[in-house]
């Protein structure tokens, strides 16, 4: 029998791969009331939930294990909650040897809030619907580049850079590209930053 460990010491065997703990990166999207939040609380505990909708607390009594909820109302509060949630998950890993879950309910709202955060910086008192995001700033960066930095680098990438389980929810919308192409029954897609779906290893559509 070939002693692969002596030839390729960095290679993982089948048995080792089976024993290795799987880390989940899940995006669950759908209409309200389809069970997206419910599913999140079944993820590996502890679950630290950043709740942008103010509803998650109403179903926690149904679940066992440690669940912590941050009820947030804007981008800044969500960013602070993210830092605290990561600290909490790190403490559980170090002290209890538990790899928990970071849940954001929902990432659709985070995309809206990143836009609102940018508007507050450049156009105080206005909403994103009142601002044209097509102009370039003096630095040469477009409005959308700044918004994506708020959402992607300052928020999403911080989660993706961890070894914890991730669960994001999103609302459902029609694929307008498919509509423009003339499809009679266009597929649904998750609302929010368009690359969220590609940053997930599993995508669940809740009906």
Task: Describe each region flagged by the PLM.
Residues 12:
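N-terminal donor/sugar-recognition subdomains of glycan-related enzymes
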Residues 25-28, 144-146, 182-183:
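Short, flexible loop segments at the rims of nucleotide/cofactor-binding pockets, characterized by
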Residues 33, 151-152, 189:
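Amphipathic coiled-coil/heptad-repeat helices and related helical stalk/stem segments
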Residues 45, 66, 118-122, 184-185:
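Glycine-rich, phosphate-binding/catalytic loops in enzymes
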Residues 74-163:
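Phosphate-binding/switch loop-helix module in NTP-utilizing enzymes
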Residues 158-207:
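Phosphate-binding/switch region of NTP-binding enzymes
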């Amino acid at each position: 029998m070939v002693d692969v460990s002596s030839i390729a010491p960095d290679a993982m065997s089948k048995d080792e791969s089976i024993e290795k703990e799987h880390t989940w990166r899940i995006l669950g999207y759908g209409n309200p009331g389809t069970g997206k939040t419910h599913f999140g609380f079944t993820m590996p505990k502890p679950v630290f939930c950043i709740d942008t909708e103010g509803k998650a607390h109403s179903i926690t009594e149904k679940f066992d294990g440690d669940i912590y909820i941050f009820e947030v109302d804007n981008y800044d509060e969500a960013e602070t909650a993210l830092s605290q949630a990561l600290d909490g998950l790190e403490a559980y890993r170090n002290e209890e040897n538990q790899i928990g879950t970071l849940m954001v309910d929902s990432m659709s709202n985070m995309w809206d809030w990143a836009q609102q955060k940018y508007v507050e910086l450049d156009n105080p008192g206005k909403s994103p619907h009142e601002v044209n995001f097509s102009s370039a700033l003096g630095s040469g960066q477009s409005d959308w580049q700044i918004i994506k930095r708020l959402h992607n680098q300052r928020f999403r990438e911080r989660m993706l850079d961890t070894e914890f389980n991730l669960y994001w929810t999103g609302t459902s919308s029609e694929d307008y590209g498919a509509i423009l192409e003339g499809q009679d029954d266009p597929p649904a897609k998750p609302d929010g930053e368009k690359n969220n779906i590609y940053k997930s290893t599993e995508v669940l559509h809740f009906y």
